[in-house]
Amino acid sequence: MSLFNWPLLVTAILLGMGLGIQAPINAWIGKRLGSPYWGAGFSISISLVVILLFVFIMVRTIPSAETIWNAPWWVWLGGIFGAMFVAGAIVLGPRMGMALFFTCVVFGQVSISLLIDRFGWFEIQIRELSVSRILGVLLVIAVILLIQKEEFGLSNSLE
């Protein structure tokens, strides 16, 4: 992908902003419902309704049960990790602060993505590991340290 494929880049950024908004909203609803897990359940239920609408409007076909059951074992991990992320964001986001939480999430995503790209896991096209990609991960670590530097008594608050 070209660095200048602006529509894709902007769409990805907007999706990331949506995730940034989703976590505190889910935390709010979880608090009102009495448990972060109720908040996660509420959020995932809404997600299910929305994605089913997309499927029925845009795809209009239903895969066979055989296709689903014959899929590799790891396809089930997507839903499991999705639920864990939503619940984890509700619990950890407010405690850590949303900026630190999501920077740690980005670090986790980029780190595992480098391995997925390098080894072609989950039938992804192999992409070589490079110095610039490793430096990118190190920069995310630097951002984590900068965001939480107040923990080390190095505050430079704008307030």
Feature map (PLM): residue ranges:
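Hydrophobic core positions of alpha-helical segments in small-molecule transporters
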Residues: 42, 104-105, 132-135
